[in-house]
């Protein structure tokens, strides 16, 4: 059984962008582009999970490359899926909120002098 690399584009992108990444992987990996239709996070959740559920039985391991809003939707939707590695390119996230919740920096960091 092969391994899969799934590319998820950003808004206005296309699954065809996955072709760029083929040169980075040997024949043990099938590079797939996921052309999702969702525009809102709660729509993406179901669509992304269903797509990955259809892939999981067919591959030994799945790697993920996701861009922009596709990366954001992936983080929200796929945290429980068996993805071996993920590369997020320019994900749209609320970094201030993330930093505050993991408590690595004091809230004073965000205040004006």
Where are these regions (language model features)?
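Short, surface-exposed "cap/lid" segments of acyl-processing enzymes
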Residues: 1-39
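Short glycine-/acidic-enriched loop or helix-start segments at secondary-structure transitions
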Residues: 16-18, 73-76, 97-98
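Alpha/beta-hydrolase active-site loop
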Residues: 17, 38-57
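The alpha/beta-hydrolase serine catalytic core
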Residues: 83-113
